[in-house]
Design a protein with these regions (language model features):
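Conserved Rossmann-fold NAD(P)-dependent oxidoreductase catalytic core, especially the SDR/UDP-sugar
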Residues: 151-196
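Active-site Tyr-X1-5-Lys
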Residues: 193-221
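Alpha-helical substrate-binding/gating segment
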Residues: 238-248, 253-288
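A hydrophobic C-terminal alpha-helical subdomain
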Residues: 307-349, 377-384
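N-terminal Rossmann NAD(P)H-binding glycine-rich loop of SDR-like oxidoreductase domains
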Residues: 58-83
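Amphipathic terminal alpha-helices
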Residues: 39, 44-46, 353-411
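Mid/C-terminal beta-alpha module of Rossmann-like enzyme folds, strongest
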Residues: 267-326, 368-376, 404-411
């Protein structure tokens, strides 16, 4: 799912390149799946701050504050902003001081209501301080993520900030076997509201919608990256590639789109400067077919019935064996490719294509072994691989083998 924008504690197919840039392979642009209430997405896509679009109040280069600036995505972003020409001044906010120079450090917890005082003189806030780690207790994680976003929005409004940039994920669109490929940026947010990381991000999206209506003088930008890869990125998606097999379900095929953290940082720079507004997606152009992914990774696929896969995954989650709800498994077996139209219109292009992103992911996985999203020691990983169990939920593969053997004996 999303990256661990952590608290440490956070090639396109050669076939039909025209279609892959902007049209669905299933008829419509984005489909019309029932999702959020009509009009809610339009609020985010159409909102602009008072005055000229893309310019913060007062004119000139904006003063930008970045939360979570001492680590992960936030650290990468403040480093880029400090070296760039788009931003006038960078305020780095975290619960401890980081090592980036050329910025002003303000040490505070993003959940502290006193944050408003730390935003004095700030034009734009980019909120990256999220805990999306697979092993974090779900209730603690949600409290941190949702309360943090809520405090940032409230403090920004109280402090007269002109724009807040929130980072969620393209996963909020949901992964479905009938998803258009690609999804349009204004497609309904169809992910399930549950106890997963995606549930946290949906709550943050809802906070953004409410802020749009309650604070018309403050613009909200929401950035939704595809599956993140890069240094320090640790998610259930990246762990899918640490397993001995790639899981697929019968009758459906995932298409794979990635977003390198460097590309996300460059997109956030544009958002901070007001050059891209509203809600938009970021990722590599196009997508990879299952056969391409298998060739690039050297991992074989294991195909299982959908009913068996999801029922077994649900039992494993309830038993505390796997770290994520069953709905998270949808994101490795169903498509959720997004069309990054807004960034293209702004002249932005990714530095990494999907094949290059997979190469980075494979380099990062060296020495790691995962089953059902849970990291294993070397001995356990060897046993798992020998058992032939596949992909994100290796135990599901074992269950399928046992069930098929029983059927053969009965016949």
């Amino acid at each position: 799912m999303l990256a661990k924008l952590s608290r440490e504690r956070w090639v396109v197919s050669n076939r039909d390149a025209e279609v892959r840039r902007g049209r669905s392979t299933r008829g419509g642009r984005s489909g019309g799946r029932a999702g959020r209430p009509a009009g809610s997405e339009a609020d985010l896509h159409e909102l602009r701050p008072a005055g000229e679009p893309g310019r913060e109040p007062g004119g000139g280069r904006p003063v930008v504050a970045v939360t979570g600036a001492a680590r992960g995505l936030g650290h990468a972003l403040v480093s880029r902003l400090a070296d760039g020409a788009r931003i006038g001044r960078v305020i780095a906010i975290d619960d401890h001081r980081g090592d980036t120079t050329g910025v002003t450090w303000r040490v505070t917890d993003v959940r502290d209501p006193a944050l408003a005082g730390r935003l004095a003189g700030v034009d734009v806030v980019v909120h990256t301080d999220l805990d999306l780690a697979p092993e974090t207790d779900s209730r603690q994680r949600r409290t941190f993520n949702v309360r943090g976003a809520q405090t940032v929005l409230t403090a920004a409004a109280a402090g007269g900030v002109g724009r807040v940039v929130l980072v969620t994920s393209a996963m909020v669109y949901g992964a479905r076997p009938d998803n258009p490929v690609p999804l349009a940026e204004d497609a309904p947010l169809g992910a399930d509201q549950d106890g997963s990381v995606v549930g946290d991000l949906l709550e943050i999206e809802q906070l953004a919608q409410r802020s749009v209506r309650a604070q018309p003088g403050m613009a909200i930008t929401v950035v939704r990256p595809a599956a993140l890869v890069g240094e320090g990125i640790d998610t259930l998606i990246t762990r899918h590639f640490e397993a001995p097999r790639l899981l697929t379900v019968k009758g459906s095929a995932a298409r794979w789109q990635f977003c390198h953290i460097d590309d996300l940082v460059s997109a956030l720079e544009l958002a901070a400067a007001g050059e891209v507004t509203g809600a938009f997606a970021v990722g590599s152009d196009g997508w990879l077919e299952p056969e391409q992914l298998e060739e690039l990774t050297g991992l074989k696929r294991i195909e299982l019935p959908a009913g068996l896969t999801f029922a077994t995954a649900q039992r494993l989650y309830r038993a505390g064996i796997t770290p994520a709800p069953v709905n998270d498994l949808h994101f490795v077996v169903y498509p959720w490719v997004v069309d990054c139209e807004a960034l293209r219109a702004a002249g932005w292009h990714p530095s990494y294509d999907n094949a290059a992103a997979v190469g980075v992911l494979l380099d990062q996985r060296a020495g790691h072994h995962a089953v059902a999203g849970r990291r294993l020691g070397r001995k356990d990983a060897t046993i798992t691989a020998a058992a032939g169990a596949g992909a994100t939920v290796a135990v599901i593969g074992t269950a399928a083998i046992v069930r098929n053997a029983r059927r053969r004996r009965r016949s």
